Amino acid sequence: MANCEGTDGDGSGCNGWFLVQAIVDKQTGDTVSEDEDENATDTGSDLADFIDDTTDICVQAERETAQVLYNMQEAQRDAQSVRALKRKYGGSNLNKSPCAKPPGVHREQRVTLQELPVNICNKQARTNVYSVPDSGYGNMEVETAEVEVTVVNNTNGEEEGENGGENGGSIREECSSVDSAIDSENQDPQSPTAQLKTVLQANNQKAILLSQFKHTYGLAFNDLVRTFKSDKTICTDWVAAICGVNPTIAEGFKTLIQPYALYTHIQCLDTKYGVYILLLIRYKCGKNRITVGKGLSKLLHVPESCMLIEPPKLRSPVAALYWYRTGMSNISEVSGTTPEWIQRLTVIQHGIDDSVFDLSDMVQWAFDNDVTEDSDIAYGYALLADSNSNAAAFLKSNCQAKYVRDCATMCRHYKRAQKKQMTMAQWIRFRCDKCDDGGDWRPIVQFLRYQGVEFITFLCAFKEFLKGTPKKNCIVIQGPPNTGKSYFCMSLMHFLQGTVISYVNSTSHFWLEPLADAKVAMLDDATGTCWSYFDTYMRNALDGNPISLDRKHRHLIQIKCPPILITSNTNPVEENRWPYLTSRLTVFTFPNAFPFDQNRNPVYTINNKNWKSFFQKTWCKLDLQQDEDEGDNDGNTIPTFKCVTGENTRTL
């Protein structure tokens, strides 16, 4: 016979059948006991207490009792700690809270809460407790009382019969003792919190803070700072005076501020308002007054109304000396690198150098950097104040505008005299020294050949042009529009630093005044009217002979007209209207349009580097080598200009 599924066989293993034999002692006809009911149904209720679980229930009850007692004690301690902390750090804002009530109301509420029974579970009473307004700082006693009542209600449970009265009594006694201590502190007018409340309630808080700062530190706060009218002005260095700081927080503040700053100088002195902190800080990035105030308020738990925040004085030796001297004393905690403005104002040599301004040093700087405009001189020299003591003294002076005008005037005088003493060859050499190397002369020659100009012919005319030979003192580049006439001539003027005159100013008597200080001049796009003016008034100028110039607010001056380069769409030689200009002009024609590549870049690049290479290549052809043997001991054809006293170089 096959085995049944899921079994190990009949009578084998643990799944087999077993026989149960019941032994019945009672037989039919025996007398039934009185405490037995024959008609009763067997419900199994007689087995309810079959297992003895009294031991487990007792153990569980003991554990719950201990846990409830522990929770109650912890809640007591937490409530006392919260009350003490709120009293310390939040008491100053109690009266300023919009939800705060007069002190009498709080005392009445505290009395009412103390009179409540500990086992209170009335919904109406609990609603009254929760309805007390809170601003976040005030009403600390009400909050703690509410916490204690709730804890007792949750923890008493079944045990309030025996221990409820004792626990409730102890809680009420502790609450009463703490509240009485708080009331006594509130009533003490000499406590730091009460003193700080007077500051917060004052009409002019800043005046009280300034007065207390001077009384504490012995100097005025404004002696160390300069005023920023806007709260949004950004600065990296700030000075802050914080009043009413808790001593414990003030001690930890020295460590908490380190991640935000590159330099800190902290002083802490005790006052009747609490700890008064004086802080000089350099942040890692620029911040405005609002950001600084929020950051310090978060670290110190002090409202921003108890702070004075301004940037330090960066040019006051007295302020810098105060930070320097107090930084070496034991009342200050200093960390980081000392700011450069403190070092500059406290080092003796720097103080001596900064006190004297030398105009010649400023003129020498402007001359060496070829700066002659007033605005450029003022801005450029002011940027050197961090590294140049004379520039720092210039910024301290009240006569900056006068110094700038005098410097620009003297620099122009020196530049004009230097240019006047140079020959054309020296001037070209001087301009070549100002340019970088790496140019190529070939694009210039290729462009002339592209326009059909013979290079040798142009070179001969250009040599006479640079020498200022009479009747050869003017070169005209004429041709159709867009042939590169202005591009070619303007690049040459830029390299030689020539002067450009415009016929649009011809109605003025002074439109030719720039020719007085020029080595080379240019007039762009001369029209028929302009050629008529030249034919009438400027024949001597085109000849290269001396002419008389009228200058504004000055006497007439007699000069030899510099070489003039003119561009025009009209060929004056072919016109019969100006027969007297034919012998005075050397004309080159550019007939072809200027070429560009596919990217609209010039095919022939003409710049300062290429012109330098061109002059170096054709130096002998242009007959410019006559001044090479003339020079100073250093081999320079141009003497070095110095308007300051030289310094002896110390040899090692």
From Swiss-Prot:
Signal peptide: none annotated. Residues 153-173 are annotated as: Disordered. Gene3D superfamilies: 3.40.1310.10, P-loop containing nucleotide triphosphate hydrolases, Zinc finger, large T-antigen D1 domain. There is a cross-link at K560 (Glycyl lysine isopeptide (Lys-Gly) (interchain with G-Cter in SUMO)). GO terms for cellular component: host cell nucleus. ATP binds at G479, P480, P481, N482, T483, G484, K485, S486. Residues 453-603 form the SF3 helicase domain. Belongs to the papillomaviridae E1 protein family. It catalyses: Couples ATP hydrolysis with the unwinding of duplex DNA by translocating in the 3'-5' direction; ATP + H2O = ADP + phosphate + H(+). One of its GO terms (biological process) is DNA replication. This is Replication protein E1. ATP-dependent DNA 3'-5' helicase required for initiation of viral DNA replication. It forms a complex with the viral E2 protein. The E1-E2 complex binds to the replication origin which contains binding sites for both proteins. During the initial step, a dimer of E1 interacts with a dimer of protein E2 leading to a complex that binds the viral origin of replication with high specificity. Then, a second dimer of E1 displaces the E2 dimer in an ATP-dependent manner to form the E1 tetramer. Phosphorylated. Can form hexamers. Interacts with E2 protein; this interaction increases E1 DNA binding specificity. Interacts with host DNA polymerase subunit POLA2. Interacts with host single stranded DNA-binding protein RPA1. Interacts with host TOP1; this interaction stimulates the enzymatic activity of TOP1. Keywords: ATP-binding, DNA replication, DNA-binding, Early protein, Helicase, Host nucleus, Hydrolase, Isomerase, Isopeptide bond, Nucleotide-binding, Phosphoprotein, Ubl conjugation. It comes from Human papillomavirus type 70. Its EC number is 5.6.2.4. Residues 188-354 are annotated as: DNA-binding region.
